[in-house]
């Protein structure tokens, strides 16, 4: 079943009613769409073209990029591989990935494109975060944006999901049990994540009761935004970091899936602790203990590798005060 999420024109300040809708979407689902975001389809197509050339290389060549730049299959999923480009110097990060196997002209064009994309997405995250803070009222974005989110940084993953050829023959039966998880159920380790997915779709979010799954379909000219664990904790649990997954195979269609996911995070040294004004909206009960962002990221990384069929540990496991469940 498809989930109808609100769509926000992020090119202009949101009205009071739109801010209310934004707050409601973040509380109920932790997902929404944005339009007029400044990232053109032409840029997306160029990124896909360059990245496809990299993904088509032999595994031995791709592994030369190193573990910090390339995630091969069977780390997060047997069907998933990704390139990582980290800010704030997106150019240098991209260049370090492809230096090993590309010519200088291709290297510079690829790195320049990654730099442009990373900088656009960083500015977009800043704009979205200010809107989310404004949705709380009380001028929260003026009070806390610079002090709490001013040092946030971003990185993005270029994701390639591949259907195994030995599972392509039986896809016409429409059997829900025959679906393949390209990436298993998880939450994001970010403040916010922005996803640009192709027209194949496959993104699903788990309902609050933990029973159902809803499709978040691609929407023309729109990007998907979701709340991550760090913002979930910073808002004392008021905004939802939802469990979600990616499906590769569904009812009569088989193909590769391509997406760009930009993760906007606190710096590693940031102590995550909900402000009193935010806690007050939860009847004054503090739900999460304070924690250092880098400690949480290391906790997640140590608990996720190779566990394809398990929902990874989240900030709920790491920092929630036990008697507040």
Swiss-Prot record:
GO MF annotation terms: dioxygenase activity; metal ion binding
Protein's GO biological process: root hair elongation
Induction annotation: Down-regulated upon phosphate deficiency.
Keyword Aminoacyl-tRNA synthetase: no
EC number(s) recorded for this UniProt protein: 1.14.11.-
Short name of any one Pfam family annotated for the protein: 2OG-FeII_Oxy
Tissues expressing the protein: Highly expressed in elongation zone of lateral roots.
Cofactor note: Binds 1 Fe(2+) ion per subunit.
Domain Fe2OG dioxygenase: 152-266
UniProt keyword terms in alphabetical order: Dioxygenase, Iron, Metal-binding, Oxidoreductase
Signal peptide (UniProt feature, chain positions): none
Gene3D superfamilies: B-lactam Antibiotic, Isopenicillin N Synthase, Chain (2.60.120.330)
Cofactor: Fe(2+)
Residues noted as binding Fe cation in the record, renumbered to the chain: 186, 188, 244
Top-level taxon: Eukaryota
InterPro entries: DIOX_N, IPNS-like_FE2OG_OXY, IPNS-like_sf, Iron_ascorbate_oxido_reductase, Oxoglu/Fe-dep_dioxygenase_dom
Binding-site positions, 2-oxoglutarate: 257
UniProt note: phenotype after gene disruption: Longer root hairs under Pi-deficient conditions.
Keyword Ribosomal protein: no
Function as written in the Swiss-Prot or TrEMBL entry: Negative regulator of root hair growth.
Family: Belongs to the iron/ascorbate-dependent oxidoreductase family. GA20OX subfamily.
Protein name as it appears in the record: Gibberellin 20-oxidase-like protein
């Amino acid at each position: 079943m498809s989930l109808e999420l609100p769509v926000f024109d992020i090119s202009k300040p949101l009205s009071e009613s739109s801010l209310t809708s934004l707050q409601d979407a973040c509380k109920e689902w932790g997902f929404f769409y944005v339009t007029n975001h400044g990232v053109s389809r032409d840029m997306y197509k160029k990124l896909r073209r360059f990245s496809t050339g990299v993904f088509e290389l032999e595994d031995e060549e791709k592994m030369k990029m190193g573990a910090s730049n390339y995630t091969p299959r069977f780390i997060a999923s047997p069907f998933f591989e990704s390139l990582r480009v980290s800010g704030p110097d997106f150019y240098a990060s991209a260049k370090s990935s492809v230096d090993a196997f590309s010519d200088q002209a291709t290297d510079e064009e690829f790195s320049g494109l990654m730099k442009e994309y990373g900088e656009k997405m960083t500015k977009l995250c800043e704009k979205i975060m200010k809107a989310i803070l404004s949705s709380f009222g009380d001028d929260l974005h003026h009070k806390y944006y610079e002090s709490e989110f001013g040092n946030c940084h971003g990185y993005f993953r270029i994701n390639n999901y591949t259907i195994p050829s030995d599972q392509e023959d039986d896809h016409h039966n429409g059997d829900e049990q025959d679906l393949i998880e390209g990436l298993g159920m998880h939450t994001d380790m970010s403040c916010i994540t922005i996803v640009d997915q192709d027209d194949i779709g496959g993104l699903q979010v788990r309902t609050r009761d933990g029973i159902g799954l809803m499709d978040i379909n691609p929407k023309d000219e729109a990007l998907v935004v979701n709340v991550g664990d760090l913002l979930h904790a910073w808002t004392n649990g008021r905004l939802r970091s939802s469990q979600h997954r990616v499906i590769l195979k569904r009812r009569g269609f088989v193909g590769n899936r391509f997406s760009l996911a930009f993760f906007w995070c606190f710096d590693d040294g940031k102590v995550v602790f909900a402000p009193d004004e935010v806690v007050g909206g939860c009847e004054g009960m503090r739900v999460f203990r304070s924690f250092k962002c880098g400690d949480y990221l290391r906790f997640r990384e140590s608990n996720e590798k190779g566990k394809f069929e398990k929902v990874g540990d989240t900030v709920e496991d790491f920092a929630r005060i036990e008697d507040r469940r």
